[in-house]
Amino acid sequence: MEFNNSVSTIYWSLLERKFSIYVLTFLNRLKCILSNPFSISFSNNKYPSFFNANKTFLKRDSCNLFPNQSNIMFFLVVLSKRLCPNYFNNTGEKKNRGDNINDSSGNRFIDESYVSARKSMSKESNKIKQMNRKLAWIEATLNDLDIWRHSYSVFSSSTKMENNLEQQFSVLESKDTPITMMAYESISLVPRSITRTLSRFKTELMGDSNSLILNEFRLAKYQALASIQYIGCLLFILSIISMLSKTMFLKSWITNWWNTSQSHIFLNLFQEERALKELQEMEELLWLDRVMADYVKDQSQDLDIEIYEETIQLVTIYNEDSIQIILHLLTDIISIVTLIVLFIIGRKRLAVLNSWIQELFYSLSDTMKAFSILLLTDLCIGFHSPHGWEIVIGSFLEHLGFSHNKHIISCFVSTFPVILDTVFKYWIFRHLNRISPSIVATYHTMNE
């Protein structure tokens, strides 16, 4: 609203200035036409009444009501003198030598006045031309602003941008130009390169290439900023929520419930086996230390006390470990739920992020695209990938508090990469082979 008011004010000021220039030009022309406020009677003396008339006009113009009119008058009189020399020289033969001296002085005065009048009028014309250039530049700038305002929707604040996010990520259409831009282009049967080429060709034929370039630049800039901001907001919100939920109420509530409402120490059999193994190793080390130190049999009671203390310490450690496992599990559930809610709320931002990632990928060269696909597939489903999957699955199971079961891990490693390989091949066959066959050819060549 403020932008429209400013543009209207500039337009009215421009119109007012133009109108004032037209009025002044009209008055100057009118003064040139009606430039005889005195009677110029040329008698036997060549120009005496002209000098009297000039003095009379200067007296009349003492209030500076008509600036530079005297110069215009001199210019018109001298011009008429040069155009009609016979009229001014019909009594020249009857003049004496004194009249010739007066005539020469009058001629010099008229010539000087003529030169000064021409200089002043040239200065005025230069000023008018400079002012017209400035007005033309202002008018052209306002026209460009008007075209830009109709071709690209500008949001005045971030809140307004969030409220109108659906309009921003849908189709941006110009009222004056048939330019159509989209923040997200879904994959269809017709390749996007063909539709973009046809759209660009149509726009260039209609003379709207400047607006198209401006729209594409602003749209790409907005997509990049919106995607980076969205990723940063996701990471920040997830970390803040998980940290606050863990420290504020989950940890105290789980600790109180685990220590008072139930009598278990271990969550699963894996923890019990690991605790028993550590206790046996500790007893063996204590017996070995006493044998090496040649302790007497009377000190066996002290050994039982040490074993009891170590057992209590192990129980405390595993009890805290069980609390941490439950805490991590609940925190992960809260983080996943929060992430799903953020995805649902920010569906438009997620679409922009998807479009930005696709644009980054498709903007690469064919060799870089094939290299990226080959690197990703080798990491996930390559020859050495099962060892990595075993480490990842084992760490995840330990994070959730489950036992390190080799059969489950081997079953997962033998099935999941196969499914992932099938998905990759389908994606390459379904999309890349249709959009860019050169990428598929380069990928197969590098893979072989």
UniProtKB/Swiss-Prot annotation:
The chain crosses the membrane at residues 224-244, 325-345, 373-393, 408-428. GO terms for molecular function: antiporter activity; proton transmembrane transporter activity. It is a multi-pass membrane protein. One of its GO terms (cellular component) is chloroplast inner membrane. Its main location: plastid. Belongs to the CemA family. Contributes to K(+)/H(+) antiport activity by supporting proton efflux to control proton extrusion and homeostasis in chloroplasts in a light-dependent manner to modulate photosynthesis. Prevents excessive induction of non-photochemical quenching (NPQ) under continuous-light conditions. Indirectly promotes efficient inorganic carbon uptake into chloroplasts. It is found in: Plastid, Chloroplast inner membrane. It catalyses: K(+)(in) + H(+)(out) = K(+)(out) + H(+)(in). It comes from the Eukaryota. Keywords: Antiport, Chloroplast, Hydrogen ion transport, Ion transport, Membrane, Plastid, Plastid inner membrane, Potassium, Potassium transport, Transmembrane, Transmembrane helix, Transport. It holds the Pfam family CemA. This is Potassium/proton antiporter CemA. GO terms for biological process: potassium ion transport.
